[in-house]
Amino acid sequence: MLTVPRLLRFRPRPSILAVAVACLLQPQASAQFNNAAGVAIDPEGVLRTRIVTDAGLSAEQRRAAVEALPGDLRKAAPLRKVALSRLEAAISARGDRGVPDDVAKLAGLTRIQYVFIYPAEGDRPGEIVIAGPAEPWVTDAAGRVVGAETGSPTLLLEDVATALRSFAPGQPQDRLVGCSIDPTKEGLAKMQDYLRTVGKVNPKGGADQIVAGMREALGPQTVTVQGVPAGSHFAQVLVEADYRMKLIGIGLERPPVKMPVWVDLAAAGAVAANALQRWYFVPDYECVRVSEDDLAIELVGRGVKLCGADEVVKPDGTRLSASRADQASRTFTEAFTAKYAEIAARSPVYGQ
């Protein structure tokens, strides 16, 4: 979760807030429609957005990618099943030759909708099968694997393996999987000192000077990953979705669908100078259906919910819960949640 300082106290117009908060995130460019976006980590370990301006694949490129797939995988299927034991056997049979592409892409599954359990009978071992919609896949210009027909992200074996290992038998089942992007306590204290020096209503210096001072005072923020290896693709997806959602909220990345964003909703002078806003995702499935014999499970809905929390910062950089909720933040989080399916359809990282 990225804490976004709210700097409206000395904002003469809405655009100044976006410029001021930009110093905290350091994106390389605003993502626009028809562009592919991702994240990259530079040699100093700083997370930045990565924009590919001409991300579209030509019809010929898509056709060639699909024709290179095994016959049965060239067509979309409303329900495709993948047996985990056969998956494991296919991987073992390859030895050190690497995982076949159709195995690495889980036969083109775009989501897991069902889990079927087949108990052992006689000499036949038991089996666990995952199932869901599937389609042929291509790799877009940003390096993301997506369905050739819908653009939905393709499930990856490495992500499923990471998830299974995180909740392996014998491990605590209540462990948290997530990420957090936070300023340091020292950085917050230094920024509070800096804001007091520039004034509240009539700041000393122009916007560029204030932004530079804030950037230097706050310093780098820290990315923390919980529950999964920090170097995994699973972790990268968590961090990218979290990071880019905040860029949308503060106006540094254009939302892929029409929706209100926090930077346009927040009113000058309506918040305290030491206020902080936190936004974070949580699962929000409608329900999990289980058959009467407990051998079949269906995940109903494709829910992700965006939540918000209001905080204030003490002079020493300590963060405390705020006593008053921010209506602009609530409107933004509710809109993001309501339009999540549309957003994910246009920006694959949210589908992942």
Give a label for each model feature.
Residues 30-352:
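Outer membrane pore-forming secretion/assembly proteins and partners of Gram-negative envelopes
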Residues 1-12:
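N-terminal secretory signal peptides that target proteins for export/translocation
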Residues 11-26:
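Bacterial N-terminal signal peptides
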